[in-house]
Amino acid sequence: MDVIDSNEIFRKFDYSSVITQADIDYAIQDIKGIIDSGNYWENSPKFQTKENIFARQHPTWMKFRMSFLFSVFQYFGQEVKVGKMQAWSFMTNKEGAEDRETLWHHHQHVLEPRMMSGIFYLHIPEDVENRDLCGTEFAPNGPENDGKFHVKPSDFHWLVYPSKYWHRPAAPQSSKYRFILAADVEIH
């Protein structure tokens, strides 16, 4: 399986000067609280939060929300008109691993407005077997076809890409939890 760092379609934006480890620690504790309260989907990767986590009114979530939005602007090289924006989190490990084939998804069926997606890796366990293969897997030609690849996860970065591309979380490689923040925004 091929692995890339980024390219002209799957782009990364560095927020290490804005988002701190304390922000990440706060977000992880908040996500654990959401999961512990039972507010997660049962038909998604275990555990995926139900609520729009960007709607939380806390300075930490504002940093994540605004950094994602600014990443989208950077992606286009200009400010663009946006619509609905939402985010959720995955808290996954080997014990909660699901059938990999059911996890593929995209927004290609939505022609207008266009959608952009983003992924922020909050925490990847230190004991993963291969860090390059623990982020997100993409299938630009569809899940049944050749050309699949992984994008290497980078700490303190947003990975931004058009939502029309098939994607899924990489298989968990640790019994410890991996925390991922995922977001979508409409572009008008």
Give residue ranges: language-model regions.
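Short, Φ-rich (hydrophobic/aromatic) sequence segments
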Residues: 23, 27-35, 119-121, 181-187
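Catalytic core of non-heme Fe(II) oxygenases with the double-stranded beta-helix
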Residues: 78-171, 176-180, 186-187
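Non-heme Fe(II)/2-oxoglutarate
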Residues: 1-81, 101
